[in-house]
Amino acid sequence: MNTKLQDSKSPRLKNRILLTISLLTIVRIGSFIPVPYITKEVLVNLLSAENSSNNTFAQLLNTFSGGGNSSFGLLSLGILPYINASIIIQLLTTIIPALSKMQKDEGEYGRRKLVDFTRYLTFFWAIVESISISYSLREVIFEWNLQVYFLISLSLITGSMIVLWFSELITKNGLGNGSSLLICFNIVSNLPDQIKFSLISLKNQINNFSNIFLLISIFLITTIGCIYINEAIIKIPLVSARQLLKKTKSEEKNSSNSILPLRINQAGVMPLVFTSYAILFFSSLFEIIKKQTNIFNIFFQYPILNSVISYWFLKILFWIFYATLIFFFTYFYSTIVLDPKDVAERFRKNSVVILGISPGSSTRSYLSKILRFIAKINAIFLIYNIIGLQILESILNLNIINIRGLGFTSQLILVNVLIDTIKRIRSFLNEEENYF
């Protein structure tokens, strides 16, 4: 592939690479352009890495902006409003029949309308998140007033819409999905800080070499697991009406090549994103109840309850709750990505059947069974890497396994985007080779 990249007959690919790198670099630089009234002292007090580790929204912002909130700038809100808007539109298409019809039956026109809806919703979410961030800064900005509030919000909204524009340019004229590449690039840009943070943490721990070996081993194992789960597929053999009419043995042999490939990682990283939002909601609800009532203080007044509700009890309870949410959202999002009813209907329209399975309800039941199996494997993989690493971290007293927020989420995003980008580059090279 390197030889092909150096070939002068690949100007379009080179232009795509240059455009992608240029826009990603501009976005990264833009995250360091100061927002009015937000100084370094403000960031240290509110948005530093140490404080953000206990704030789920800050963790999400860290993941999707690559730690940009440690140097909060004009473009630091980044692609997060667009991610939120895309999730909501995906959910609404499964709930609202008109949107579902627009997506499935109206072709390119329907897809363009959904893209427009996503843009409008992105603008709305940019307003909501910018106002929320501005309001959270009121306690650490000395000269707080409505003008400061307005300028900070306006700056973040403008930056978010610029990032959305760049993302669409990359998707249309660059190397791949713009939002995914932006997230990936920001995560990679923050790796030096993460490595530095890890080395500092190791200095304060006993058996440094064993910890380093353990960290590297865990990183390699999880990376291999991410690659495997991302590339693994289940092949379901298909037969069309045209193939059934073929009589010769050679044709029957060739007809077995038609398959429906179902990825094991159907839901991708979205179950973890949904889970993070759910944790954010319940954490906020807990804080509101705690401030407004003294119900939790009443519980801890009793010695028996105080001894039972220990640190480890709460930790285990949280892990069970976390794992349950991941399992639920993996099943939920898998049905959004691949609806067995829709697949069975498309098979019926195209006169295609699954080998050995009757069309109609039998096909739908069979696909639902396969989808449940896939979702179960995917959920176990995510739970093992998220909860398992947290348990190992607590038992071994290691503070570096999940570096700064959603470490495994970032790792899974990196693997998915890098594999997809390599495939797209190969596809562009093959297209240009055939063209010339």
Swiss-Prot record:
Keywords: Chloroplast, Membrane, Plastid, Protein transport, Thylakoid, Translocation, Transmembrane, Transmembrane helix, Transport. Component of the plastid Sec protein translocase complex, which is composed of at least SecY and SecE. The central subunit of the protein translocation channel SecYE. Consists of two halves. These two domains form a lateral gate at the front which open onto the bilayer between TMs 2 and 7, and are clamped together by SecE at the back. The channel is closed by both a pore ring composed of hydrophobic SecY resides and a short helix (helix 2A) on the extracellular side of the membrane which forms a plug. SUPFAM superfamilies: Preprotein translocase SecY subunit (SSF103491). Disulfide bonds: none annotated. It comes from the Eukaryota. It is a multi-pass membrane protein. Pfam families: SecY. One of its GO terms (biological process) is intracellular protein transmembrane transport. This is Protein translocase subunit SecY. Belongs to the SecY/SEC61-alpha family. It comes from Vaucheria litorea (Yellow-green alga). It is found in: Plastid, Chloroplast thylakoid membrane. InterPro entries: SecY, SecY/SEC61-alpha, SecY_CS, SecY_dom_sf. The chain crosses the membrane at residues 17-37, 72-92, 122-142, 146-166, 209-229, 269-289, 309-329, 380-400. GO terms for cellular component: chloroplast thylakoid membrane. Its main location: plastid.
